[in-house]
Amino acid sequence: MKKIQTFIQTSPVCSYTEWDLLEEIIVGVVDGACIPPWHAAMEPCLPTQQHQFFRDNAGKPFPQERIDLARKELDEFARILECEGVKVRRPEPKNQSLVYGAPGWSSTGMYAAMPRDVLLVVGTDIIECPLAWRSRYFETAAYKKLLKEYFHGGAKWSSGPKPELSDEQYVDGWVEDEAATSANLVITEFEPTFDAADFTRLGKDIIAQKSNVTNEFGINWLQRHLGDDYKIHVLEFNDMHPMHIDATLVPLAPGKLLINPERVQKMPEIFRGWDAIHAPKPIMPDSHPLYMTSKWINMNILMLDERRVVVERQDEPMIKAMKGAGFEPILCDFRNFNSFGGSFHCATVDIRRRGKLESYLV
């Protein structure tokens, strides 16, 4: 036990929850962001009104003015975190327009804006996730320099099975089933794939959902990889197009949970005794472009500890809700970054939080 404790104390990577005191974080970069080539796996994940935009502009850069505005907000976000005492690291921008591939397919890239999706930190283990989108196949390349540094510093560096992403991984001829009562997922169980953003950490317990990028095979692989110290609980929500859990259910602190009232209509039994804070209805105007998400991206907040929380500056209802629940909102403009498919949690992966492995569920 003494050896384990020493390893944890010296590892540069160590994080067990979404709320322990944040000491180090990676903030993404939006430079060079490209619109991914259209693929059937994207259809159930993207807003219907954006499908034609992606089809018409596949492989092209995102509008430069959008990139510039988002970069400005990201840099300010990083500055705010540093002012709050957090060490901020950034990935290396990569040329997303380069063509790459594997047997049977080719693609260009997308961006390195959302480290939350591609890297999962559980304890002292930083895991590269086997992503389901072909356009994200080499996305972790932007983080390799940091990953090597963390490994040399004592962290455990793991990687999920590198997927083939052949046609067998996707439902042939997928179409929306209007009569379905549960999500009609576009990925199969051919091989394990998962995005880190379909998991949220509560010490010894990890909440997960199956989605259009995360399959049961991937969840089972992760559970076996993590071993008996952790238990993954797979929950199903009232979401017909699941992709990433942070706009559905967000642990804020021990015993406090932010929930999407449209998707979480009944409190999961494992959260018995927890306080449920209903996320206020988003107020983002319809005129603001959201290429990849719904307006519920307003739930994608970031806890710096059990009290401080980063919230979008213009989201007055969320600011009020956080204050009412006893939290201290730290405000940051982020709507232009929201256009690219994420907010504060998506734009980051916490590398080190000051805490220990505990159980918080009944």
Curated annotation (Swiss-Prot):
GO terms for biological process: creatine biosynthetic process. This is L-arginine:L-lysine amidinotransferase. It comes from Pseudomonas savastanoi pv. phaseolicola (Pseudomonas syringae pv. phaseolicola). The gene is amtA. CDD domains: amidinotransferase_AGAT-like. It catalyses: L-lysine + L-arginine = L-homoarginine + L-ornithine; L-canavanine + L-ornithine = L-canaline + L-arginine + H(+). Transmembrane segments: none annotated. Changing residue 243 to S: Abolishes amidinotransferase activity. Gene3D superfamilies: L-arginine/glycine Amidinotransferase, Chain A. The active site is at residues 195, 244, 346. Keywords: Transferase. Changing residue 240 to P: No change in activity and substrate specificity. Belongs to the amidinotransferase family. It comes from the Bacteria. Changing residue 241 to N: No change in activity and substrate specificity. Involved in the biosynthesis of phaseolotoxin, a nonhost-specific toxin which is a key component in the development of the halo blight disease of beans. Catalyzes the transfer of an amidino group from arginine to lysine to produce one molecule of homoarginine and one molecule of ornithine, both being precursors in the biosynthesis of phaseolotoxin. Can also use L-canavanine as an alternative amidine donor with L-ornithine as amidine acceptor. Disruption phenotype: Mutant loses the ability to synthesize homoarginine and phaseolotoxin under permissive conditions. Its EC number is 2.1.4.3.
